């Protein structure tokens, strides 16, 4: 299982990531997609972004399209068979149409809440064009709606709700081969835990619809992972320091 960074935000207020953080603190943000192979399928967790309006708004450092970034692992965009969307914020959904053969998996409640106009306008991080794109992919038969918590969608990949970053955001567990040839469970938190600081200090994310539910989801991640170090936060540049190989924006989570 690999984390692939396709862009970095050089300075972002930490108080928007970690509840109660000092207002003077700033953090770098890694924009990442996660790549894994399961049962002959090539699966992404989240799809990143690429449209020019987001690049202009955020001015990210070292940007490359997610479809280009995954070529570092030898994959072409058309090799990707499945994309698990943790939630439909712009920086996780926008790149879904870069992968022409991929099935898109997300929670039914998330889809139905945010692809109607009344739900989308309640969250500034929902891009209406992305929501329309997702609805178009569903009409094309490429979207699979997940019925709820604890759903194994692909052998070895199970999704869980409760983090409440959005209406029905999800995180995933992945059964993977780890260092030394052993098998274990990796947890991909996505934005249900932005940084290691959320997890290691048990601090809720700031942008949550339900702080208590977010803390419970973090505790659940701790129970599900084979080891706490195998819980991977959604935007922490330290992922690429704790898992430094093979390098150049790619981290092998093992």
Functional labels for PLM-detected ranges:
Residues 60-63, 169, 173-254:
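Cap/insert and terminal regions of metallo-dependent hydrolase folds
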Residues 84-92, 165-169, 235:
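Histidine-centered divalent metal-coordination motifs
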Residues 1-75, 79-82, 108-161, 180-191, 211-233:
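Metallo-beta-lactamase
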Residues 2-4, 84, 105, 144-146, ...:
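Hydrophobic/aromatic beta-strand patches that form the interior of the parallel beta-sheet core
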Residues 56, 93-100, 242-247:
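Metal-dependent catalytic neighborhoods of phosphoester/phosphodiester hydrolases
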Residues 3-5, 33-37, 43, 52, ...:
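Core dinuclear metal-dependent hydrolase active-site scaffold
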Residues 60-106:
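Active-site metal-binding motif and surrounding structural segment of the metallo-beta-lactamase
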